[in-house]
């Protein structure tokens, strides 16, 4: 349905019966079977399923890579504002492959190909898929940005236990004990290992994975299913899925080397001001309450209170 003919999200939310799940997707694609750079999707369970613990509601939004360069700080600010506005359990942001909303399974082979080609920093699997929405006591993966509610922060050992150097990691508090962690100044798919060699995981992601390992899922339902006649490789077995979940896990001596490699990458300090300014605007536009006090490591760059 064309954008100008589609009902507004607010109308959908208020007109959908309480016992009915709400599923809506808006994309910049020019055809329902095509893929767009921009996407905004909502999956909300009906009241009965929600009260009987049948999974999590999901919000997905995507922008092209160029958006991060042309609108510095906007994406991080929007992600943070959404975390402050909604009762989130967990969330993450980074590189991914947009697939046609109406043809996910038929295009999963392309998602798998790009993830193998460009590196482990590429997310795989439908954010609104069964294996993801059923995760509550664990997270699927680390990424450029990770959001955790208070329960997950405690399960990870507490915010103070995260030994993440502030020059390369933003730690933005939100809500009643929640935490957003940004790993590095920009998302990464991989680090080159040289001609003819598989790409290596980004050091910032490896170290964040090690810090959050207690709450990262070790098992999940399959991340991809494909079609009945598909012969392309996919993450459509539990073994392949579990291997993907551990793609950032390295031997202890290799983790030590990642600390040295991290120090060769750009720091986050100069990017914080743009995020803070945009976040302030979003809070006003969305009517959000006053933010929690600064911890000195967030986007505001202030001193702990």
Question: Language model features by range: what are they?
Answer:
Residues 1-117:
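Internal, hydrophobic cores of structured domains that mediate oligomerization or house catalytic pockets
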Residues 101-304:
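C-terminal interaction module
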């Amino acid at each position: 349905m064309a954008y100008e003919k589609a009902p507004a999200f607010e109308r959908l939310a208020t007109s959908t019966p309480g016992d009915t799940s709400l599923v809506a997707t808006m994309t910049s694609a020019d055809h329902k079977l095509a893929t767009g750079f921009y996407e905004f999707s909502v999956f909300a369970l009906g009241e009965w399923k929600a009260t009987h613990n049948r999974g999590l509601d999901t919000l997905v939004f995507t922008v092209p890579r160029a958006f991060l360069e042309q609108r510095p700080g906007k994406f991080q600010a929007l992600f943070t504002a959404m975390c402050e506005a909604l009762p989130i359990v967990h969330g993450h942001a980074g590189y991914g492959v947009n697939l046609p909303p109406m043809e996910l399974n038929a295009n999963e082979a392309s998602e798998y190909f790009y993830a193998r080609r460009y590196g482990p920093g590429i997310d795989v699997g439908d954010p609104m898929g069964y294996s993801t929405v059923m995760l509550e006591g664990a997270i699927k993966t680390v990424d450029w940005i990770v959001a955790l509610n208070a329960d997950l922060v405690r399960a990870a050992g507490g915010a103070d236990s995260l030994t993440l150097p502030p020059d390369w990691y933003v730690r933005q508090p939100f809500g009643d004990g929640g935490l957003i962690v940004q790993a590095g100044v920009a998302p990464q798919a991989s680090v080159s290992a040289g001609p003819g060699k598989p790409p290596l995981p980004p050091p910032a992601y490896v170290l964040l994975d090690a810090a959050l390992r207690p709450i990262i899922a070790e098992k999940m339902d399959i991340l991809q299913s494909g079609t009945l006649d598909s012969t392309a490789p996919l993450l459509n077995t539990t073994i392949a899925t579990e291997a993907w979940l551990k793609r950032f896990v390295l031997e202890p001596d290799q983790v030590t080397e990642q600390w040295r490699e991290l120090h060769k990458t750009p720091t986050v300090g100069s990017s914080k001001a743009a995020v803070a300014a945009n976040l302030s605007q979003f809070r006003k536009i969305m009517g959000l309450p006053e933010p929690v006090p600064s911890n000195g490591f967030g986007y505001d760059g202030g001193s702990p209170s």
